[in-house]
C-alpha cells in the first residue's frame, strides 16, 4: 500500500509492504543467492580440477623432456667412452704389434749375426786349411772336396780328401 502526501512542495511517499510478501521475496532472494553460490562453487571446483589437470600435464611434459635430454646425454657419453676405449685399444694393439716386429727384427739380426760369425769362423778355417793344403798338395797330389750346409741354428762343413 502506498500513500502520497504533498506538503509545501515536498513529496512524501509512504510505502507499507505486506510482510508475508516481503519474507517470501527475501527467501526467494536467499535461494537465488544460494543457487548462484552453489553454481559458482561447482564452477570453481571444475576450474580447479581443470587447472590441476593442466599443471599435471605441463609437469609430465617437462619431466618427459628432462628424461629425454638425460637419455640423449647418457647415449652421447656412452658413445664417447666407447670411442675413447676403442682408441686406447687400437693404440695398445699398434704398440704391441710394433714391439713384436721389433723383437722379431732383433731376433732375426741376432740369428743372422750368429750364422755370419760361424760362417766367418768356417771361412777362416778353410783359408788356414787351404794354406796348409797348398803346401801339402805339392808333396802329395790329392784333391779336396768340400760340402757346406747352413741352417738357422748352426753351420755344418764337411771336407773330404781324395787321393788320386
UniProtKB/Swiss-Prot annotation:
The keyword Ubl conjugation does not apply. InterPro entries: IQ_motif_EF-hand-BS (IPR000048), IQCF (IPR039887). GO terms for molecular function: calmodulin binding. It comes from the Eukaryota. Transmembrane segments: none annotated. Keywords: Repeat. Residues 43-72, 99-128 form the IQ domain. The keyword Repeat applies. Pfam families: IQ. PANTHER family: IQ DOMAIN-CONTAINING PROTEIN F2 (PTHR21633:SF4), IQ MOTIF CONTAINING F (PTHR21633). This is IQ domain-containing protein F2. It comes from Homo sapiens (Human).
